[in-house]
Every structure is written in structure tokens, then in C-alpha cells.
Amino acid sequence: YGRGDEVLLCLAQCLNDRIDPSRDFVGHIGGDDFLLVLGSEDWRRRLNLLLEDFQNQCRRFYRAEHLEAGCFIALNRQGQRQEFPLLSLSIGVVHLHPEVCATLDASQLAELASQAKHYAKEVIGASVHVIDTTAPGFKPQAAS
């Protein structure tokens, strides 16, 4: 668990390094989930740099042979040896258009964020998935 805490602190530092504190916000939801509210116009560039930063910073958590192999073997929670991929960052984005903000409630926004994160995590390795509410024809689903 100590190593996991180090990784979370590393991620938090990478997040803080890539935001503009006068326009952006970083929050820790829990576990390995963080929330970014980005008001910066160059948010896409910032997120791409964040992916690079985190990838580079994570190298210190591995031995050379792990980096070369692209994975490592460790005991899983059941005590069995298992191959694990190297750490990667998955970012789910909800790009909000001001007109859509007035029609979304908190549960709809949370659902969109959950969907974006889900799609980002489906990709192997570092990824960003954007749900763009500025896209023509975007209609939020009714809250269930």
C-alpha cells in the first residue's frame, strides 16, 4: 500500500503541475479518482502533457527489467503470482458547452463523467476520452 500512496502523491503533483490555479481546480474524489475542472483554453494540451508527465514520473517505481518488459509480476490480492501492466493514466473528459450547463443536473453530469472515465479505461495504456457537449446534436440522457 505504501507504493500505491507514493503513486497517488506523484499523480497529485503531476495534476497540480499542469493546472493554472487562477482558472482550474484539482480535487481528490477518493482512491485513484481525481476531479479536474479546467477553465483554461488550452485544456487539451494540458491533458496531453499530463499524460506524458505521469508516464515519465512513473518510471521511478519500476526496475529496468520491468520497464523493458512493459509489465511486472507480483502477488495479487488472492496471493497468486500475476502479470500486471505498467501504470498508465486514463482521463475521462466532459467538455461542457455553456448552453448545455443550464440543462444538465448534477446526476446527469456525474453520469457523463462516469461514462467518459469508463471509455478512457477501456483503452490499454494512457488515454483521454472526451464527451463533447459542444458537438452538434448532443442531448443529455434523462437522469434515471
Q: What label would you give each PLM region?
A:
Residues 33, 42, 99, 135-136:
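Conserved nucleotide-binding/hydrolysis micro-motifs of P-loop NTPases
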Residues 14, 53, 57, 119:
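Solvent-exposed, charged/polar functional surfaces in cytosolic regulatory/catalytic domains
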Residues 28, 62-115, 127-134:
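A short glycine-enriched loop-to-beta-strand structural element that forms part of the catalytic core
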Residues 116-144:
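Intrinsically disordered, glycine/charged-rich C-terminal tails and inter-domain linkers
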Residues 33-68:
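Short helix/loop segment flanking the catalytic signature motif in cyclic-nucleotide metabolism enzymes
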Residues 19, 58, 114-117, 121:
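Protein kinase-like catalytic domain
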Residues 1-16, 20, 27-31, 35, ...:
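Conserved long alpha-helical elements within nucleotide-processing catalytic cores of c-di-GMP signaling
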Residues 22-23, 125:
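A short helix-to-beta-strand capping loop
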